[in-house]
A protein has these predicted regions:
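A hydrophobic alpha-helical transmembrane-helix feature that marks the membrane cores
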Residues: 1-251
Length: 251
């Protein structure tokens, strides 16, 4: 009996040690993802602010575009920026299994910077104070939703399928409203966008957590970290933009 007790205790300690190693590895993996995401968000914000200040002059309380502003906010540059950012995110997503982690991270940062160029135009529409306020509201909401996705024992995959269908419908509605310019439809789109990306934040966090494998080598884990960071970055940026349509103060 004493031999059984000793063997059982040794086995229990071994399982506990393995779980501790997995928990430590998972924690490091998730922290790396959040750090990469934060780097991307910070870079987007800095580039957007610098671009706006280079693109706009203020005279008598009124904003006017500089020659640089006219170039990036109108004409072919807008299309080039849109297609360039779309191409980058598709490249990272489709080629992630072939890219080295450092290369994937570099492409992610290039994408974040390019998106900062595009998003700098929000400063033309909304006041800086309201943008800052909505950013912190979005950050707090994102943090709470991501924490829920990380800690919940509930399987969110059925919700994820529903959210992806909702996202497709949202994109179609946004394209339609470009031509209709309907205020009520715009309000519905904004509300749906907030709800969809709130749900996606929790779902993606759970999915990223479940992708962790302590037996994989560092290269594969590094690729997953970059892809996870890009996914959460896009969730946050879209959540912020849809919230800005609700709570932002227009100039």
């Amino acid at each position: 009996m004493s031999d059984f007790d000793r063997n059982y205790a040794a086995t229990t300690r071994g399982v506990g040690a393995d779980r501790a190693v997995i928990d430590a590895g998972l924690r490091a993996y998730m922290i790396r993802i959040y750090n990469y995401m934060a780097m991307g968000v910070a870079l987007t914000g800095v580039v957007a602010w610098i671009t706006f200040n280079a693109a706009v002059t203020e005279t008598g309380g009124k904003l006017a575009l500089t020659s640089f502003g006219q170039m990036i906010y109108s004409g072919p540059a807008v299309i080039v920026l849109f297609l360039g950012t779309l191409g980058l995110v598709v490249l990272i997503s489709w080629r992630i299994d072939k890219l080295q982690p450092a290369t994937a991270l570099t492409l992610f940062m290039v994408y974040a910077g390019a998106l900062g160029l595009m998003l700098s135009s929000i400063f033309l529409t909304y006041t800086g104070t309201s943008i800052t306020r909505v950013f912190f509201i979005s950050a707090a909401s994102f943090g709470a939703l991501s924490l829920y996705g990380y800690t919940t024992q509930r399987d969110l995959s059925p919700i994820g399928s529903f959210l992806m269908m909702g996202l497709i419908g949202l994109i179609i509605a946004m394209v339609v409203n470009i031509f209709l310019q309907s205020g009520p439809l715009g309000f519905v789109i904004s509300a749906a966008g907030v709800l969809i990306f709130a749900g996606l934040t929790a779902w993606d966090t759970q999915k990223i957590k479940e992708m962790y494998d302590p037996n994989e080598d560092g290269t594969i884990t590094g690729r997953k970290s970059v892809m996870g960071a890009l996914t959460l970055y896009l969730d946050f940026i879209n959540l912020f933009l849809f919230m800005l349509r609700f709570f932002g103060d227009r100039r």
